[in-house]
């Protein structure tokens, strides 16, 4: 009916220019340019295993993105709150781009969340197996929480209800709906910092660029799952896996380009 959903696209210092250029070259894929805003994710220093900060050049510290939990803070820093307020936005749908079947601004998901009275919602799928590498939506101390697969014990992962279903059986697909008002209330709250071992390019003492083949230090990230835990409640909204979950984590094999292509074809997409 002539209405458009504003899109806020988070980029990095590395890919920002290329991303904007890509949209411009494709004329924003027919979407009104005024409804598309780009912003750069904030960065934090990376260090070695002893806590020494790596250098990217003689004058620049090696930096890394601050994790997917930094999206709202990065929007605020980019001055986009004024745009959000001017448009009268009450809900923000945040999602990961490595799932090519994400259904965004889903009216049923939005409606279910609003009708529930909850201040957030999370799309979930039934886990394909107890050891599937997805975080699961649960409650912790009376508040919504997401337990990452690597944090779960074997006993937790395989626990079942009386009807045989997995006790922790609903995996998140990184598609969340948040009350904009609540996001502003928690904007200044301190989020947990997750220390992640990664491969960090840097220069050595002689000024040579080093691109390690093994993890050589730590990056420091905030995660969107911690934002869910900061909500008073969160409605789990189950979707059909084959219609909305095609993660791309690998080139081939499980959760790969190959499996994503087949799932897209199954949804009627011509490649």
Where are these regions (language model features)?
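Short, active-site-adjacent cap segments at secondary-structure transitions
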Residues: 16-17, 100-102
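Catalytic core of tubulin tyrosine ligase-like
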Residues: 84-93, 101-105, 110-270
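Short acidic donor-binding/metal-coordinating loop in glycosyltransferase active sites
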Residues: 97
């Amino acid at each position: 009916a002539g209405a458009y959903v504003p899109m806020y696209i988070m980029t990095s210092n590395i890919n920002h220019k290329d991303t904007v250029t890509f949209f411009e070259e494709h004329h924003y894929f027919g979407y009104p340019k005024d409804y598309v805003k780009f912003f750069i994710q904030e960065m934090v220093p990376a260090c070695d295993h002893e806590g020494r900060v790596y250098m990217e050049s003689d004058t620049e510290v090696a930096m890394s993105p601050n994790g997917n939990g930094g999206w709202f803070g990065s929007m605020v820093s980019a001055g986009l709150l004024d745009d959000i307020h001017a448009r009268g936005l009450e809900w923000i749908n945040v999602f990961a781009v490595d799932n090519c079947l994400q259904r965004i601004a889903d009216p049923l998901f939005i409606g279910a969340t609003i009708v529930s009275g909850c201040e957030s919602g999370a799309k979930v799928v039934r886990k394909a197996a107890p050891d599937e590498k997805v975080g699961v939506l649960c409650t912790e101390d009376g508040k919504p929480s997401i337990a990452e697969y690597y944090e779960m014990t074997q006993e937790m992962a395989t626990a079942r209800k009386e009807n045989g279903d997995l006790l922790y059986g609903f995996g998140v697909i990184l598609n969340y709906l948040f009350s904009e008002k609540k996001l502003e209330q928690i904007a200044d709250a301190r989020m947990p910092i997750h220390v992640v071992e990664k491969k960090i390019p840097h220069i050595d003492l002689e000024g040579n660029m080093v691109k390690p083949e093994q993890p050589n230090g730590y990056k420091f990230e905030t995660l969107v799952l911690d934002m869910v835990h900061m909500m008073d409640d969160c409605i789990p909204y189950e979707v059909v896996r084959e219609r909305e979950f095609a993660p791309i984590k690998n080139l081939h094999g499980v959760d790969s380009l190959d499996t994503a292509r087949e799932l897209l074809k199954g949804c009627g997409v011509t490649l």
